[in-house]
UniProtKB/Swiss-Prot annotation:
Domain of life: Viruses
Keywords: Host membrane, Membrane, Transmembrane, Transmembrane helix
Organism: Colorado tick fever virus (strain USA/Florio N-7180)
Topological category with respect to the lipid bilayer: Single-pass membrane protein
Protein localization: Host membrane
The keyword Membrane is annotated on this UniProt entry: yes
Main location: host cell
Name of this protein: Uncharacterized protein VP3
Transmembrane helix in keyword set: yes
GO annotation, cellular component aspect: host cell membrane; membrane
TM region(s), chain numbering: 618-638
Amino acid sequence: MAQLLFRKTTQDFRDCFGLKHEILASIYNEKSTFSSENGSIQILEEAEVNALGELVRDGTVAISFGPGIYSRMFSHLRDDSDYRSALTDCVAHGWKQTRDARDVREWQRSAAIMCAERYMYKVRQAYKRVVENLDHMYAWHYLTEGPSEHVFILPAMYESVRHETTSEAYGMQCGGIIGGNVSLMLPRDEQYTTLFKAWLMSLAKMSLSELREPHWNGVRVQLSRDHRILYYGDLLPSDGDITYLVNKLEYHTIWFPEGDFETMMGAMLRDSFPAGCHAHLNIPVPHYFVFDTDDDLILRCWKGVRDTWIKLRLGYEEGGVNDSRMSEALIVNRDLPADLSESLFCCCLARGVSRDQVRTLKDVRNVAQAQIRHVVSGQGVWWEHMVRGQPLACSIRPGKVVLVVDYEDGPLHVSIRVRLLNVHYARELGMKASDVVVRIPTSNRPRWVETKEYERSLRFYEFRPGPITTEFHHVFAFYCYWGCGRVEKRRHLYQIREVRRGNLYSRSRFLRRIAEDGEKVKVQGRTHVTATRAVQHEKCNPNEDIIYSREFARELALTGKIKEAGALAVIYTCMQTLGVDIDPPAGWVREGRPKQRTAKLCHLLTRILTAFFSYRGGSSSLVCSVMVVIFSIILYYLRLKHVDQEVRYDELTLIWYGDGGVELQRILREVSMTRFVAVAGDPATPEYIAQAKLWANKKSNIVVFNYARPYERGPVFENLIRDTVSLREAAEVFILRTDDSWSQYGNTVVAMLGEGDFCDLVHFGASCDPMEHYFVHISQPPGTNPGYEPANQEEPFEEWLYETQAMERVIPTTWESEIVDARGMLVSILTFHFRFAGWFELDVPGDDIGRGLQLMGSINKVVHVSCFVQNGRRYFRLSVDLDVDRVLRNMRHEGDALMAAELFVTDAVLVCEGLVVGEMHRLQRTYRSVNAMVYHQGMTNFIVYEWMRRVLLTNLLDEMLVFDIGGRNGELSGWVVQDVKVHYFCVDPAGEEAIPKGQRVRLPGGRAIWDIAETVEQNVARYLEVVGKPQTPAEGIILIFSNSIVAAYEAAGRNNRNQVANLYQQLQAWGGRVFIRDQLVPTRANPGDYWIQAAFPGNVYPPGLCEDFNIDPDAGILPLRYPDTGQGATDVVLANGRLGHLTSSWFQSLYCGAARGFILNGFGRLIWPIYCRHVVVLATRP
């Protein structure tokens, strides 16, 4: 079993604090909305409306908020009449419009939002009373006199509102500490801990009756528990939702502000009341919980067991746990029932349970019994108890609480330079703003200087998850693998292949979870929670070029159905990857009862899309599920294309197994598809498959298996897949959702199919994962000519997935998930251990801006500078995004010291000194959504590093000369200079900056270039002569070509393929080592053909919407900056054993994206499986 990655964070503790100006802005922001404050609504019990539209039952809803002033709930501000009144109004308004009681959940959700926003208004008014009394009722704790930020202690503000004032609660005249300042030069978490303890001590001192100094180690502060969820509506039963039941408990938290963990533990064990604590504290101040009765403690323990299950389940689904602790089980001072005692131990050992399976207390108890038997039998756990080499079953004494020690620790290694000519103009420019962006070039003669003055003050923040940028037409696009052209078989340099599984698989999912903001997408400048909500939004419409790209879509758009027209235009264009044309005839929209089959089909699809766009909300995967239904209906039509019988779509039988079926059923009812059957549950279980076989006794038109457990692996899951695919015999069109695991069992599945059957893999743009596919099988159709077979069947489509998913060790896997400080981040990069990307901040006095720019310019050439005043002194805040290339190029690590190359900061200092004073603020940065080409280029240097590392391992020479052809400013220098015997030389006439870890090759007449009129040996000989090493053997020389080298040859003559092929032949014969970056492997033998078959992407969208692609009528579709190497070059590579391909898999590219701060945009996710199949790098064997 794969080891679950655990990444311990302090975010729970950091959420207890808020910057003063941000908190005040939230309190006085009257335009705050439920969604802007990250509000969440959960419907526990659905409201009930009778046939007359009268509200019979209110139901129950739970409301919660993200970090901030609303995160902790005030029960005294809650009013059930607000919810009742809002729900009555929503039901009355909704009933007038639809008269459909099935919409009651949406009415209930709308009422909850209205109620929540009324509650938010009351919270703001309560906090206003607190901040208006800051000066005379509360104290401000100052930790430093230097540059600092002022922060509120949110729990202190919460206590002030809950008890009206803290002074009333404690009978004192002072309200205690409510905030303070934290130094910008010291670690933030340590200062937060000091400030939190100071607040608790202020409460303790107010409650002391004696003046003598107490023993501070034993001081304790008792506070009532805080609430994070607010419930409205009807009461739930005593064995109902367990979160609801625990929320109703009133217990206390005992804090030890000056004590240690052992002191707290001893006090908890001696407490006369039922009590418990966590083994790992999310707030680093010792504390435990005290309950009124044993039953309350037991209920809270069951909640801990349940929360651990859910956390583990999500961890395996998402690749890891990013939290303050792994286990939520409590250590208690009471003897517990045997089943609970054993569950506190067993809950940590298996894969967890989904939230829906353990909603109620009864569910938790039932699952606990089953899991105890599961663990005791030794099945399905990640650990083994060994005695003398023999595995033993787990033995737990009833009534004894056992702590899993050290489980929380997890695995150990789980631009242009502008010279200012007018100083006065620079100052005038600065006076117009309080912040500015400056560029810091490297000095002409760089020397290495130490950066220790500001290393301790430097702060690092990880990027926040970012939304995926996409467009309307990308969501409805798809393609079939077999229709995307054929690529010649490659020769890989590294033949160590591993299927993506185990720990690497978990980490890849974990990387996506950290970098991507859930399933949020950004469309046309607006951020939406899901792609489903995005395309349903009234202001999200397709581009006109899409609508008018097909005549039938233009006709539909004229009727006002803009979204439907745009979606159908994309869908019908994508069907051309199957080589079919099913456009309806002219005038099809005006036919009331169409008789022509293509018109009838188009009318049906239009009604489905209309029902989907008008559907209120829906899950994140709903749009993808709708696309699967539409695609399956089209395939069913194609299967019967040559059959004379009439097709009646209202009699179409479609069985949907797995997630999304209930929502689809509501949509398809609107179009009279009454024979759609949704079978709820998890398809990835033997019990579910047994149930499916009962449905399979009768032939169905379409069967869809929508799997939702992608983290499962192993022979048991493969057998389950085989059993599932065997059910295809009960369907004419069979579709199975799968992911990268297809590379393990795909060949077996294809071998099960009958002769003449059609099968393919389909990739939908609506899918959130580039490696999620749908396997399609169509049984042999009646008739002799099915009319939809792909033109090219020479290569099995499984090879597409293997090339893009199987593991090739071309990227270093030295990945670290632990959180480190700013200096640790820089040291990790310099030792080629990569982590999650982020940004750096530094505050420097106004008279020392030069040294600050020196350090920050070594991390990124572009520096954001703002000016503020602190304690009457002028400061500058410098912030930069992490640039891995820049750090490796301009910094080095010597012993314990960090050294940076000297930069030219004079011009930037002049601009910064002219800034006016503004408010101090922190820029919140997210992972950047980039196109496929930027994402792929971000991987290349990682590949170069690993290849260079292998070269050095096999090299026996005293020195190696690296010539980077087209290296611009030597961004690659830090990646290849891994040893003192490596010397880097840049050959490029366009570079502007000096290279600290190398030098440029300069000729008497200027900078050296690669002369395409000369041979490889002649060019190399000229370089060696210039650098003074003419006797260097070829074995000691490395040539690294940028992706512009082939373009340079092509520029000499149109389609200059022969010269390019000649270059590759020379490189094959030459004795040195060669690396060629980012080349394009053509699809066809004819160099003039498209690199991807004409059906994609040129016909998927109009040329103007093919993002990042040039449309050349002579050469076909070429991606920008990636020239076509020509078939001749590929033939040379395949014919000779010296040059080979280096291709990285999708999950390895995630490492690079996370290290650079990139996430792939919507079009990139659509095209990525094909893109990384064609764009490769070439190199000689190390």
